[in-house]
C-alpha cells in the first residue's frame, strides 16, 4: 500500500515566507481596510528581533505573541494577524502539528468577516497547506481513530479549497487522490471502496491537467483499481503504459502479473477457456518485455516456464527449461530438474525424463530425492532391477522429502525381485516414521510369514 508521496516539509517551510508576504499585504488591499492596532504594531519589533536572532529565539517570539493575544479582542483582526505569526514560528521550528490550531483559528476569524481578513489568494494557500498538515498528521499517527479524524478534516478542507480555487492543477489533484486513497485504506482489513473510487476520479482529473503526468498518478490508479479488483481496467492501463514507456520494467512486470491474476479468477469460476486466454496474454507480455531487454532474470524465465506448463504446453516448457538450466538462465535447483523430468513425462517421453533427472544428479550429487525420482520413473516402466539401484542410492544419500516412502518403495521393489530379506529390512525401517507405521507393519508381517513358511519348507525337505 503506498504511503503519501509528497514532501510536506519542503512545502511547509516555504509557507512561512509566503504568509509573511501575504499578511503584510492585507492592510494594503483596496477592499480590506484592516490593520493592526497600536498595541500590536508597537510590540511587533520585539517579535521581529527574536525571529531575526541567530539562531532565532522561538520561545521569546512565542511568549511575545501569547502576551499580545491576551490583550486583543478574540474576534479581531489583531488576533487573526497574531495567529498567523504564531503559525509561522511553528512552521519554522518544524512543529507542524502545533501549526494546525492557529491556522484553523485564523481562517475561522477571517471568514466570519465581510470582507474577510485574508484575501482570496492567502485564504486558498492557507486551506491548501492545512490539507497537507492534516494529511501528514493522519499518515504519521498509529492511532486509527485519530488518523480517520485527520483524514476527514483534510478531505473537507480540500473540498473547500477546490470550491474557492478558480483552476485546480495536477499536483493538487495528486495530493487529493493520495489523501482519498490513504483515507480509504485506514482499515486495511475493510477498505472503503467509495473513497478508492473517488481517488481514481481525482487521478483522472489530474492526468488531464498534466502535460507530462508523473508516474505516481499511474501507480496510484493501478493500486486503487487492483484493490477494487477491477483487473481488466488495470490491464488496459498497463498496456497503454508499456507502449508509452517501454523502458519501464515495473510496468512490464505488473502487466504480466495482472494477466495471471485475471487468469486465476477465471480458473476459480471454471471458465477454463478464458483462463487459458489470459495465461497466454501473460506469456506474450513476458516475451514482449524480454524483447525490450526486461524480465530476463532466472526467476522471470522460470515463471514463463511455469505458465507454459500450467496451460499444458509441455513441449515449450521443456524446451525453455532445458535451455535455461544449461545456460544458467534458470536457477540450477533440484526442483527445476524434477519439473523438467515431469514435462517429458507429460509428453510421454519417460526416458528423456530419466536422463533429465540423471543430469540433475550430476549437478546435485548428494540429492537423494533426485535418485528417488529416477527410481520411480523406472518403476513406472516396469524396470525393477534399475529402480532398486536408485532407491538404494537415494536412501544412502538421504536428503529425502518423505524417507518412509523410499523405504516402502524399496520393500515393494525388493519383494517383486524376490529379495525378501532386503524387503523386510526396508519395511521395518519404514515403521520408524509415523507415516510409514501402518504400511510398514503390514508389509513386515507379510514378509515375516513368507520367510517363516519358506524356512519351514526348507526344514521339511
Where are these regions (language model features)?
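N-terminal leader/linker segments that initiate helical-solenoid repeat arrays
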Residues: 12, 17-132, 136-139, 144-152, ...
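Structural register within alpha-helical repeat arrays
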Residues: 46-49, 86, 130, 137, ...
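Flexible helix-coil transition and linker loops at the boundaries of alpha-helical arrays
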Residues: 32-33, 69-79, 108-123, 160-170, ...
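Alpha-helical adaptor scaffolds
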Residues: 334-348, 355-361, 365-404
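Start-of-helix register in tetratricopeptide repeats
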Residues: 44, 81, 125, 171, ...
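Structural motif corresponding to the intra-repeat A-B loop/turn of tetratricopeptide repeats
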Residues: 55, 93, 137, 141, ...
Amino acid at each position: 500500500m503506498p504511503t503519501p508521496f509528497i514532501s510536506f516539509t519542503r512545502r511547509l517551510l516555504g509557507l512561512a515566507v509566503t504568509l509573511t508576504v501575504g499578511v503584510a499585504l492585507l492592510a494594503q488591499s483596496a477592499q480590506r481596510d484592516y490593520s493592526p492596532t497600536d498595541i500590536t504594531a508597537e510590540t511587533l519589533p520585539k517579535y521581529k528581533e527574536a525571529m531575526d536572532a541567530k539562531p532565532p529565539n522561538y520561545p521569546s517570539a512565542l511568549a511575545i505573541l501569547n502576551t499580545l493575544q491576551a490583550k486583543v479582542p478574540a474576534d479581531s483582526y489583531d488576533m487573526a494577524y497574531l495567529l498567523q505569526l504564531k503559525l509561522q514560528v511553528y512552521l519554522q521550528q518544524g512543529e507542524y502539528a502545533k501549526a494546525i490550531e492557529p491556522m484553523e483559528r485564523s481562517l475561522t476569524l477571517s471568514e466570519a468577516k465581510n470582507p474577510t481578513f485574508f484575501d482570496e489568494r492567502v485564504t486558498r494557500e492557507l486551506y491548501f497547506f492545512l490539507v497537507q498538515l492534516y494529511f501528514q498528521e493522519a499518515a504519521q499517527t498509529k492511532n486509527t481513530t485519530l488518523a480517520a479524524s485527520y483524514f476527514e478534516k483534510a478531505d473537507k478542507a480540500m473540498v473547500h479549497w477546490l470550491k474557492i480555487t478558480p483552476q485546480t492543477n495536477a499536483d493538487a489533484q495528486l495530493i487529493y487522490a493520495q489523501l482519498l486513497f490513504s483515507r480509504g485504506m485506514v482499515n486495511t482489513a475493510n477498505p472503503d471502496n467509495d473513497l478508492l473510487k473517488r481517488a481514481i476520479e481525482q487521478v483522472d482529473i489530474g492526468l488531464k491537467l498534466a502535460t507530462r503526468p508523473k508516474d505516481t498518478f499511474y501507480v496510484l490508479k493501478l493500486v486503487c483499481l487492483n484493490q477494487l479488483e477491477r483487473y481488466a481496467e488495470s490491464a488496459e492501463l498497463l498496456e497503454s503504459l508499456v507502449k508509452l514507456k517501454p523502458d519501464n520494467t515495473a510496468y512490464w512486470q505488473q502487466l504480466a502479473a495482472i494477466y495471471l491474476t485475471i487468469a486465476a479468477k477465471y480458473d476459480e469460476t471454471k471458465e477454463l477457456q478464458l483462463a487459458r486466454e489470459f495465461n497466454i496474454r501473460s506469456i506474450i507480455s513476458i516475451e514482449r518485455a524480454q524483447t525490450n531487454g526486461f524480465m530476463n532474470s532466472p526467476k522471470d524465465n522460470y515463471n514463463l516456464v511455469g505458465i507454459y506448463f500450467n496451460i499444458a504446453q509441455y513441449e515449450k516448457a521443456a524446451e525453455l527449461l532445458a535451455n535455461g538450466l544449461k545456460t544458467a538462465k534458470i536457477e540450477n535447483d533440484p526442483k527445476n530438474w524434477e519439473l523438467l523430468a515431469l514435462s517429458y513425462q507429460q509428453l510421454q517421453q519417460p526416458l528423456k525424463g530419466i536422463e533429465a533427472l540423471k543430469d540433475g544428479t550430476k549437478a546435485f550429487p548428494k540429492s537423494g530425492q533426485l535418485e528417488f525420482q529416477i527410481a520411480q520413473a523406472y518403476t513406472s516402466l516396469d524396470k525393477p532391477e534399475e529402480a532398486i539401484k536408485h532407491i538404494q542410492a537415494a536412501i544412502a544419500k538421504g536428503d529425502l522429502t518423505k524417507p518412509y516412502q523410499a523405504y516402502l518403495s524399496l520393500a515393494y521393489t525388493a519383494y517383486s525381485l524376490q529379495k525378501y530379506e532386503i524387503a523386510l529390512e526396508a519395511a521395518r525401517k519404514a515403521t520408524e516414521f509415523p507415516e510409514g507405521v501402518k504400511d510398514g507393519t503390514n508389509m513386515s508381517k507379510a514378509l515375516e510369514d513368507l520367510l517363516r513358511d519358506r524356512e519351514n519348507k526348507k526344514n521339511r525337505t
